[in-house]
Swiss-Prot record:
Organism: Dictyostelium discoideum (Social amoeba)
Single Gene Ontology MF annotation: small GTPase binding
Keyword annotations of the record: Cytoplasm, Nucleus, Protein transport, Repeat, Transport
Record's function text: Required for nuclear protein import and mediates docking of import substrate to distinct nucleoporins.
Main location per the UniProt record: cytoplasm
Protein name: Importin-13 homolog A
Domain Importin N-terminal: 40-109
Amino acid sequence: MYNNNGFHEETNIDESQFTVEKVETVLKSLYFPQNNDYSALPQIQQWLIQFQKSFSSWSIAPLLLMSNIKEIQYFGASTIENKIKNNWLSLSQDMKKEFLDNLLLFLKTQITKCSTVVITRLCLAVSVIACHSTTDLWANPILDVLQLSFQDINNLDCFNPNLVNLTLELLTIFPEELTNADYITQEKRNKVGLQFNKHNSKVFEILCKIMSLPQNQQTLIFMKSSLKCFKSWILFDCSPREYLIDSDLILKCFEAVSNNPKLVEDFLMVLDEMFTFMGGKIFRSYTSAFSLVLSRILMIFPSFYILALQEENQIFNQIFLLFSHIAENHIKTLLKNPELSNNFFKALIQMALKGDFETCELLSPVITEIAALHELHSTSSTTEATTTTIATTTTPTTTSDCDISGWYQYLGEMVEVFRLKSMYPLDKDISDLYEEDAEKFFAFRVIAGDSVLEVYNILEGKILQQLLNSLWSDIQSFPTTKCWQSIEATIYLLSCLSESITEDTEFVPQLFSILGQLPIQSTPLIKSTMTLAGNYSNLIDKSTIFLEKIVKDFFPAFENPDLKSVASQSFLSISKNSKCASILSNSITQLISLCAPILSNNNKILDDPSNFNILEALLYIISTLPSDSQVLNYSTQLLYPFILFIKNYYTNQLQQQQQQQQQQQTELRLLLSSINLLTKFCKIYDDEQVNEYGTTQQENNNNNNNNNNNNNNNNNNNNNNNNNNIKPVFEIINNIIPIYGELLSLNTLESSIIEAISIFYKKAIMINNNHQNITNIPEINRQLTLAFLKHKPLSLVLSTLSISIVNLPKEQHLDFLADSLSSISSKMIQIWSEKSNQNNKKNNKKINNNIDIDNDNENNNNNNQIQFENNELNEFKNLKISIYPDITKEYFTMITQYIRYNAVSIPQGVISHLFSIILVNITKIHDKVTARACFSFMALIITKSKEMKSQIKWEPLLNEINGWLSIHGELFIKQILYSAGGGIPRSVVQFISEVIASLVSSYPDVFRISALKCLSVDGFPSSNITKEQKEKFLNSLMLYRSKKLPLKIVTDFSLVSLGIATNQ
């Protein structure tokens, strides 16, 4: 708790209370309380936090390192690191120099007396100094560190072995710390980086020397540390030429590792970074080095892989991961070297066959990269053919560079690997596995199915024939030489191909006929066969007899607890295919009759997800009936018991029947399930998915309507169902809405029920929108607004209201929308009010055209340095807009929808009041969720109002924003700059930058004039930033004048203002 990276020195601390003896005594009380009494722990922690914030800690913390108690040493080291990171600039130049010299001296002379974690902390502290002070205080940190152990860097044969590890530790941490340092500006980072890079070659030379040493226990430690250091400098993005071409380092590493398996793990990390850094950038310019390194890998690592498997050493996974990453990041480079790529894929597949299924998962991204290359080849071939037709003299394209035909054999072998690894265990039942292992196995089968499908999309008939041949062979050999597990794995993978198989489907009836004759009592095999039937519904929809036979076979399975779940899912999958559903609809009466035992009991349906699936499947089949009356009658027959239950629930609540708690919970659960069922019913008639802005996938992808025509065959024709039989759905929804209105009007209602109703209304709104029917939306809006005001405020209610806005006429004033926003805004102010959170008896105040909010004179003891003298602003000082981040987020998202689609329905005064609320409370917004919601809202409306200034309907809103800025603009900009300069946590500065960008782009003159006035004041936003630095910041902002203002401009301003960093 007290080792906090965010503490800053305070000047009002009594320094006299801190002595080294007192700090040690307090630390002993913390770590070793007498009689295990921890009652004083909070006071001890607070005292230690004060100590770390004090200036005395600069002199006392180093003395704690001399303690013989390791916990006290660690506290001292942590304090030193954090002081340097956050308060280094508070020291004078002489004090900095003395502190650095003493720290380096301690490391050189006392290293053997400290634990490893303490040394690491102190090395981190030194690296932070290097980031802060390179060039101005510490001229050559890399050179100085090298000379700790190699005093004459031109004679590497002479070195101090006692300090080699310290040198390597510092060399490892320096580039890592500089890369990740969030306490220096980008300009400073670049300066330090240039200085570090001057000595790259010497660093690699020393690492090469260490990797060449004769191996013993001590040098083995040096080598492991050297490999870690090597990895760090690779990630520092120094020139690859220095360690691939100009140095023998990589070769020396291979030599050392080949002689000692103990170095394999560390070298694997080096190689993995080398092949993956920035998407494989290192080897793009050094293909000869790629071939050399990969050849060496193929020489030694497959044997290490086998050895690790034999010893059950998990390092075999890391070896396979390296091979996978090589293919992922360098697939094109492999393609250019056929001999090397053949050896690579042979080794990869052999390792996969010997490894476990978790290792084989790593083949999946390899296949994805090959598939992408194949797609590129296909596209290039088409383009080349077109170009050749137009102009035969055109230079040939490089389609051969993407031709993967030479790898077809390996793709087929990968499919076989996935098939073998997808088999159920041969020596035990899957139920005997630990739950975690079983989950991993089934997750792998999903990955295997996806990967085989990718290969099928490349080779199509070859892969299908390969799987069918395997299946026929296994069936013929069963049970003599083949087991059901092999048959089941093949069937499972065949089912995964269903969405891509559109031709040559004659094998499907034959397949089911043969499978039906197998004398096997294996539940997994039966399950996979049923899944196959469900997935291949798009291929069997032309055969009425065959389809009805498959569905009829499901009904006995409904009575088997082990098969019921998969049978019901397959029945639902088949029913979702409109052609299959249409065929089955001819027998709907018989199907309902067969399901009668399930449908006869509401509780039985709602308590069992499988029964739920069966009922949903019947509703899908009903949706394809030819007449509206049939759809309405059969749907009502199935749904009426549940609608009646919901209505009776409301009646029972009104009568306040005395019920046992258990009975109440049962009824509540059944009520929730009934609402969910009705939502599922609506979903049948709407396959559009709603995004976070309330728009549909169709709306977002108007230009992609012709893509993926052969995919998702089970749902291709759902829209036809919607269009043909939508009137009965409207009738049922119309009957449900008043019932839900009664439920929402109850004085008490569980939040889960309100959320379920909100989800139903989301789906109902989308159905209305798809068919230009918006008559229900005003009533839905009214109900949800009432629910938000009457019951516990829920973010999901606001989310549904947001979607309702999208589906209403655009830019047309609607009274119910204005009333809704007015009431909800008042409720939000009540939620944010501290007083209302303590006492909910406060009356709801409604915002109208003359918004009237009672002035609260209580002072919140606000610590803001900016004082608000305006009474209008003072009344908002006691609000806590971060108290419920999710609700605040959805509220501002809802207003964003108003701005985007119906700004004319925003009551006058709401936006200006919200701006005032945020203005006053900016410095109290500490969480990212609230910050993103508030500042994105402000940035959008500032930008949008200016963009829409020519629109007459936007004139009132634009006038309101301009009027507010004319009154509070200077204070607003001052508060924004104060916040960016350290008034709010650094984690949310990125969102403040959005507001700055909107002001700079939409109101550049207003912003510049106010910013100049604020920044010209000495000490604003802090005394750490100079006048020249503030001028540079403002000039950088005005230079861009766009909504895409670089974040680093604002973050650098924040770091400098906080005194954490300087550009010098």
